[in-house]
């Protein structure tokens, strides 16, 4: 997603969601019930501090596969975190970004993965990649993604 787009996307999603939605900022401490949208033009990683808090790092690391933010980098950063309760969601998007990172995460933790179904995707690239990789637990229409993830999260 390009720089500048993610702030307005987060604001719009915040208006229509029951959860708090915000554009991620470097140093944000993750809070239950808040959805963070990675900044366009930045890489987003989760770092665990000495007290076990999960902190977002919005940084200028290089693009991977031309992507910045890159979902694979984000998901891979969760592998080393002590948190076990993670739910991954994969929505419409081009390519296979996220597939490698989720595969690595699933190897280290027992996590559910929810993918948007083909019928409700504008572009069925990213969801298709995780479905074909066999790492998805549930495939649901867009309108059911949030409730399905909340069911797994327990919010």
Summary of predicted features, one role per range:
Residues 1-155:
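Conserved acid/base catalytic micro-environments in cytosolic active-site loops
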């Amino acid at each position: 997603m390009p720089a500048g787009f993610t702030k307005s996307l987060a604001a719009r999603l915040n208006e229509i969601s029951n959860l708090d939605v915000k554009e991620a900022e470097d140093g944000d401490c993750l809070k239950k019930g808040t959805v963070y949208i990675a900044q366009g033009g930045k890489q987003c990683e989760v770092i665990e501090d000495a007290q076990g808090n999960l902190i977002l790092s919005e940084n200028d690391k290089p693009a991977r596969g031309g992507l910045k933010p890159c979902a694979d980098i984000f998901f891979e950063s969760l592998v080393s975190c002590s948190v076990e309760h993670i739910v991954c969601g994969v929505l419409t998007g081009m390519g296979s970004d996220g597939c490698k990172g989720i595969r690595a995460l699933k190897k280290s933790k027992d996590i559910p993965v929810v993918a948007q179904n083909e019928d409700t995707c504008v572009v069925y690239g990213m969801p298709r990649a995780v479905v074909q990789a066999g790492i998805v637990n549930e495939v649901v229409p867009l309108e059911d993604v949030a409730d399905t993830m909340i069911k797994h999260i327990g919010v």
